[in-house]
Amino acid sequence: MTGTLITEDNAELFMGAVGTNALVNSDVFIGVVDEETDTACGVLSAEAVGDRTLAIRWIYVDESRRRKGAGRELINTLQDVASEIGAGAIVCSRNKPLGKDDVTEFFLSCGFVQDEFSPTPVYSYKISDISLRDIKKEKDQVMPLDEVSIKDWAEMENAWKELEAYDERLLDIIQNREFYDKNLSFAAMDSEGRFSGILVTSTDGQIIYLEDVFAVGDDPGITAYAMLKSLVLRADKSVKDPVISVSYENKEMLFLLDKVTGGRGVQTEENILLSYFMDV
């Protein structure tokens, strides 16, 4: 297997694994190819953050190629690219089960080290434990991202950039939109058609990872609740025994989930930071 930088010249080979905008929204986009079959078997997206640091945003290896060197080839190629461009470190933030797990062990075997100060609790809430109610103040129109056209998305992006609240957090949501579950991620518009919030998730089987929630306007708490309600209602119909997982860092959503479940969240994972430091 061979790792390679993904460019406009070879992007078509890898586009089946991610959306068409992934290349544009990645500072470094790497793929791995099985030379015998000329088949793409893995992709990795990284973003330049801070001072001379690359952050792994997304990594995927085809199930049939796992434990066969594809993942290691992706990381090795990323390390080579990082060295060539003068990066000082590569970082990866991820949720891991309590105790040891194979993915963390894989990163450690590739030379990464875990930040001893980084573990942050991740709590899970069964959707069956969530009790929803209508709130009279709810005025936002909430729509799943899979119903937002490319044109409407571009218009929303332009509107977001004019917000006083626009910052790196919202920019990160925008740039990584290709990697969210659009069926279970939502945008909100107020009664005048202005952007008022976004909730983004990723999924792994029955687990719905609440990646981030951003709300603005007169009552952002009501907007966040409206998007959470849309998530719960849609997930209940499309996922078997769904569970919402959220990091302790997202205190506003933890507070809201505790309120609608009667405090039934259970710690199931922890968020850790893994770092690879380049030789200088």
Question: What does each model-identified segment do?
Answer:
Residues 1-26, 33, 133-169:
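Short amphipathic alpha-helix that is part of the acyltransferase structural core
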Residues 11, 16-36, 41-59, 166-214:
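A conserved beta-strand-loop-helix scaffold within acyl/acetyltransferase catalytic domains
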Residues 61, 67-83, 220-235:
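Conserved acetyl-CoA-binding loop-helix of GNAT-fold acetyltransferases
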Residues 74, 99, 103, 227, ...:
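Conserved short alpha-helix immediately C-terminal to the canonical SAM/SAH-binding motif I
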Residues 79, 87-93, 99-119:
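Hydrophobic, ordered structural segments
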Residues 82-97, 236-248:
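Conserved GNAT acetyl-CoA-binding A-motif
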Residues 106-134, 237-280:
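Active-site/acyl-donor-binding loops of N-acyltransferases
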